[in-house]
Amino acid sequence: MNSRLVLLLAVSVALVSAIAVGNRSSHLKKSKECSSDGHTERCEYTGDLTVKTDSTCNHSTYIMTKVTPPNESPSNGVAHCRTAPCNSEDYADVDCLVAFGADNIAAIEKQ
């Protein structure tokens, strides 16, 4: 009887875990555009991430401008991210690590 209880608990945990995860897909689109005036180079890194989990869909944007050699701007090299439900223009600022994850940020910045 004790082994049946353990088996029942294991099956219950597996079912709850499968329900919690759901069907998830994501698509990352990234780009890097640079320009130079002969003294400095200005590069803009952008990323668009769409994440769908079951019936929920979110779209996040990433933008970072990096000037080299570094300038005095406090925003130089600092990423700004926003997120919104898919098919909405009601974006809210969000922490980039939360919206994109470390792997996607690395992919955007290593172009």
Curated annotation (Swiss-Prot):
Glycans are attached at residues 23, 58. GO terms for cellular component: extracellular region. Pfam families: DUF1505. The keyword Metal-binding does not apply. Residues 1-18 form the signal peptide. It is found in: Secreted. Keywords: Glycoprotein, Secreted, Signal. It comes from the Eukaryota. Belongs to the UPF0375 family. This is UPF0375 protein ule-4. It comes from Caenorhabditis elegans.
